[in-house]
Design a protein with these regions (language model features):
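Low-complexity, intrinsically disordered or signal/transmembrane-proximal segments
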Residues: 2, 7-10
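Glycine/proline-enriched, intrinsically flexible loops and inter-domain linkers
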Residues: 3-4, 15-112, 117-139, 143-582
């Protein structure tokens, strides 16, 4: 197995197309501004259409409802040109994962109908459930671009349905698909690769259906690029791709020039590894020097035995997401150009750059701590562009059951409260910034699953950290188990270490998961697996976000509104803000 985790990486884009950079740039300079505007916006629209096609065509609730998927367009060398705004965690890694594929099989060897596929955490990928598929786009016999998608697959085998919190290594987490080239007509579409995948998963209808959704989304991207090439010509299309990346680079470099040079440090920690109570610290040193920014994770804790390890691609993605959210405006497209001024480094064998075969299924938890550590560092230099610590955890809940008709696997990523910010309160009960999944409607779970029912879902008062701008509220989601032998597996965080406040703001609430059984309450660990019985009531209580600024500076009208809406109880308002009912 190829080990792609590296001690450091320079995140730069390669040349675009077979023309030299100078030739493409010359065409870009001569490109009509109106044509450029139309083509560049069309590229972004195509990526979004691909994302919509993927979500609407999928079979599993984790993609169809939660939208745990992404789509992007690439130039011929695998540089991201445009990407759908679905999962930020996928933003930075898709080009790195693509390049792992072309290292195994150069794109010159591809034929129409071929595709690359990869989910190997030690071959450029993230965790096994995120499967990346890249399809070449041929025009006039030449590859001019690629369409790429990634979907989180509901089940890819492994030791437990949905997720395996006690996996000893990456092999126990599911089927590994190394960076490879296949033919759709020969190897998929009823061929040997499709049959191999179907034979290794518990819910083949949903899993194979989601693979077909990825191929369908890639086909949409291919068709739309062919239309653009036919209308504007290949040279203009390639030039617009190049200029779109250059535009993002110019805008980001300008933003960096406005920030004082220096080294800024931040750290955060995962609660524990599920085996002991030692917190898992992630440290980030952010260096800004002119038009460049570097992040070094030296000093972060060693890799662990459980699945909390964060592979290199995930660390890079979390870092890029933090930088983009704090230092750029939303109108700057994310693409390879944005990445050019950035470097990321992390020592081998650490939590954020583990060695094979460390398990990585829950890599989102340390990835969030990378995100938080970078934002804490940047808070020292751009305090008006960051938010306090939020729920910032993947509350992954997998409830499965094996019945006479096979497995039923429910997987959901539940949200919590955002941290308060410099201008407003944190958002209530939403997924965290890196993940950005939507909730699964109760009606959808009622239709899809017969081994449980959702019997409660709502906001948790008094969970947002106090501050001038309070943290967002956490949520509760309550399940009634209907059948004996249901399997519950989870990984979550913020159970021991609360979301931090910034600039005098208070911490948010803790997370907890409980089972009510026969009149008693069983408290689960943050990383756990248990067998459930009919009649059990399982409840997640997610954490609220930290507050921003001192609570004494909160406007009285906002406090009164919080009390009126039930977001903050009168007792908590009196204790935390000095509020009285007659104010």
């Amino acid at each position: 197995m190829q080990e792609r985790s590296s001690q450091s990486a320079q995140l730069t884009a390669t040349d675009t197309g077979k023309a030299t950079v100078g030739e493409v740039d010359a065409i870009a300079l001569s490109l009509d501004p109106v044509d450029y505007a139309v083509i560049s916006h069309a590229l972004i629209a195509i990526a979004r259409e691909m994302g919509t096609k993927l979500v609407r065509s999928s079979y599993s609730n984790i993609v169809r409802e939660a939208q745990d998927a992404s789509a992007a367009l690439f130039d011929a060398q695998g540089n991201v040109v445009a990407q759908a705004e679905l999962i930020p965690m996928h933003l930075g890694s898709m080009s790195e994962i693509f390049r792992a594929c072309i290292e195994q099989c150069p794109s010159e060897a591809l034929k129409p109908g071929d595709f690359y596929i990869n989910n190997d955490p030690y071959g450029g990928g993230q965790h096994l459930q995120d499967v990346f598929i890249f399809s070449p786009i041929f025009v006039a016999g030449e590859i001019i671009a690629f369409a790429g998608t990634v979907a989180h697959h509901l089940d890819l085998g492994g030791g437990n349905p949905g997720l395996t919190p006690d996996a000893a290594d990456v092999h126990a987490e599911g089927l590994i698909i190394p960076p490879s080239r296949y033919s759709y007509a020969r190897d998929w579409n009823g061929g040997p690769l499709e049959r191999l995948v179907a034979a290794n998963v518990r819910v083949p209808v949903q899993t194979i259906g989601d693979f077909y959704a990825q191929f369908a989304a890639n086909a949409i991207g291919t068709a739309r690029i062919e239309e653009l090439a036919a209308r504007y010509g290949i040279p203009a299309l390639l030039a617009a791709m190049s200029e779109l990346m250059n535009y993002s680079e110019r805008r980001f470099r300008a933003a960096l020039r406005a920030i004082p040079d220096g080294v800024y440090r931040g750290e955060d920690a995962v609660d524990d590894d599920g085996l002991n109570d030692a917190k898992l610290v992630v440290k980030a040193a952010v260096t800004i020097e002119g038009e460049r920014i570097g992040v070094d994770y030296a000093g972060s804790c060693p890799q662990v035995r459980r699945n909390l390890n964060c592979p290199w691609a995930s660390t890079v993605s979390a870092t890029l997401a933090a930088i983009k959210s704090a230092l750029t405006s939303p109108d700057i497209p994310f693409n390879e150009g944005f990445k050019r001024p950035i470097s990321v480094a992390a020592p081998r064998g650490t939590l954020v750059n583990p060695n094979y075969p460390a398990p990585v299924r829950a890599r989102m938890l340390p990835a969030y701590r990378c995100f938080n550590a970078v934002l804490k560092a940047l808070a020292q230099v751009v305090p008006d562009q960051v938010i306090a610590g939020g729920n910032d955890s993947t509350h992954a809940l997998a409830i499965s059951h094996l019945g006479t008709n096979g497995y039923r696997v429910y997987l959901e990523i539940c949200g919590g409260g955002f941290g308060g910010g410099p201008r407003r309160d944190g958002c209530d009960a939403v997924d965290s910034p890196l993940s950005n999944c939507t909730n699964t409607p109760v009606e959808a779970t009622d239709m899809d699953f017969e081994h449980f029912r959702v019997i409660g879902y709502g906001l948790l008062p008094d969970t947002g950290g106090p501050g001038k701008h309070r943290g967002g509220l956490g949520l509760f989601r309550r399940f009634l188990i209907l059948k004996d032998g249901a399997n519950f597996a989870t990984y979550t965080d913020r159970v021991r270490l609360r979301p931090y406040g910034l600039f005098g703001g208070g911490a948010g609430s803790h997370t907890r998961i409980e089972i009510e059984r026969a009149g008693s309450v069983i408290k689960l660990k943050s990383k756990d697996r248990v067998e459930l019985k009919a009649g059990d009531i399982l409840t997640l209580y997610s954490s609220g976000g930290g507050g921003f600024g001192p609570a004494r500076e909160r406007e009285k009208a906002l406090i009164a509104e919080d009390v009126a809406q039930g977001y903050v109880s009168p007792a908590a308002a009196a204790k935390l803000y000095g509020w009285t009912e007659h104010q």
